[in-house]
A protein has these predicted regions:
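Short beta-strand-centered aromatic/proline hotspots
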Residues: 71-78
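Short amphipathic alpha-helical interaction segments
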Residues: 1, 68-69
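Short, solvent-exposed secondary-structure boundary/capping segments
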Residues: 79-96
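Short alpha-helix capping/helix-loop boundary micro-motifs
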Residues: 48-60
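Extended, highly charged accessory segments
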Residues: 1-33, 96, 104-352
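Short, basic/aromatic beta-hairpin or loop at an interaction surface
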Residues: 31-51
Length: 352
């Protein structure tokens, strides 16, 4: 909305820029939910089943089955503002999710938590209890925490900390392989790491539906329909290539599409048609998708670059992940692998 004269070094507003800034300005993004309605209803007002987060709708396709409430539903159609479904009783489906603005644990805090766990694990029971009581825990809480760490060490032989990451492999109740990476470094590091690991596994297994979940305390990978255990070294990625791999994977994700819409809105590329009146979210999504389709042909388009920066540095913490992978490559942080019959105590807390 500005003209930059590189010869004179001046910026001037284009015609209508002032009105556009007044009517469409603001930095708080519009976010919303897709309504879920029964597709079989023929009345004027179809019955409403519930709501889904827009990112989940972006990741869903016609024919997918999901669970809402106590029932399973099959997607029959996805329109710009709603999802039409039919009942799918007895069929397993994926669980819906709703994203909030809760930032994950910073890598610096995760490193400090890992260091504290390492010192507690190395100390004797009395010394550890004294340290925990000095930190404000009562006797019962300190005893429970010490027992929790001891049970994890008994199950896997290791307790994950800032210098030791544990990769645990086991079969779930369906016979599928589960891989749990225990790490204290936080969700902003684990989210892009999980994305990269899943991409590598899909390449290895020929496009198999590898599911990767992430939390502040680790990563859970599910590898279905495989008799062989997942390969060793699953978490060992090249720190020089991981940034490009994550950028490639993020570019086609629902997260990138939603963040692009927010960046384009802040840049006044999705102006409101009527001052003082919000544009319906489905119209914003539609216009944003059209803009992204054109902008994706120009990798240096400023809004594309800003969206990439926001995803890789604000939502994720790719620099911290790269630094961690370099520490692993230089043996400053070790990765140990164990195979268990059932999930360890730490693994159970991640799975359930």
């Amino acid at each position: 909305r500005l003209v930059w004269d590189r010869h004179t070094g001046t910026l001037t507003g284009r015609p209508g820029a002032q009105r556009l800034a007044v009517t469409s300005g603001g930095t708080i993004p519009d976010r919303g939910l897709f309504g879920v309605f029964l597709a079989s209803d023929t009345g004027k007002q179809p019955r409403r089943v519930g709501e889904l987060d827009e990112e989940m709708v972006y990741e869903s396709r016609v024919g997918d089955v999901f669970v809402l409430g106590a029932s399973s539903w099959r997607i029959e159609d996805i329109t710009p503002d709603r999802v039409l479904v039919t009942p799918a009783p007895g069929q397993p489906g994926k669980l819906p999710f709703w994203h909030g603005d809760t930032p994950g644990r910073p890598a610096e805090l995760g490193r400090a938590i890992g260091a504290a766990v390492r010192k507690l694990s190395a100390a004797g029971e009395r010394e550890a209890a004294a340290k925990l009581e000095q930190a404000g825990l009562d006797e019962l809480a300190a005893r429970n925490l010490i027992r929790y760490l001891a049970e994890q060490r008994a199950a896997t032989g290791y307790v994950p900390d800032d210098r030791t990451l544990v990769v645990e492999r086991f079969r779930d109740e369906l016979g599928d392989w589960r891989v749990v990476l225990h790490s204290p470094y936080g969700d902003r590091v684990h989210a892009p790491w999980a994305l990269a690991i899943a991409a590598r596994l899909r390449e290895r297994y020929g496009g198999m539906d590898v599911q990767a979940l992430h939390t502040d305390d680790g990563i859970i990978i599910r590898v279905p329909d495989s008799d062989e255990p997942p390969p060793t070294g699953i978490a060992l990625l090249d720190p020089d290539d991981v940034g490009d791999l994550i950028t490639q994977e993020v570019g086609a994700s629902a997260l990138f599409a939603s963040r692009f819409r927010e960046c384009a809105s802040r840049a006044l590329l999705l102006p409101r048609r009527n001052p003082g009146q919000r544009t319906p979210l489905w119209q914003q999504r539609q216009r944003s998708a059209q803009l992204l389709e054109v902008a994706s042909q120009y990798p240096a388009f400023p809004i594309v670059l800003e969206t990439v920066r926001e995803v890789l540095r604000d939502v994720f913490d790719v620099p911290a992940l790269t630094a961690l992978l370099r520490d692993i490559a230089s043996r400053k942080v070790r990765v140990v692998e164990v195979e268990t019959q059932t999930p360890s105590p730490f693994g159970k807390s991640l799975l359930f």
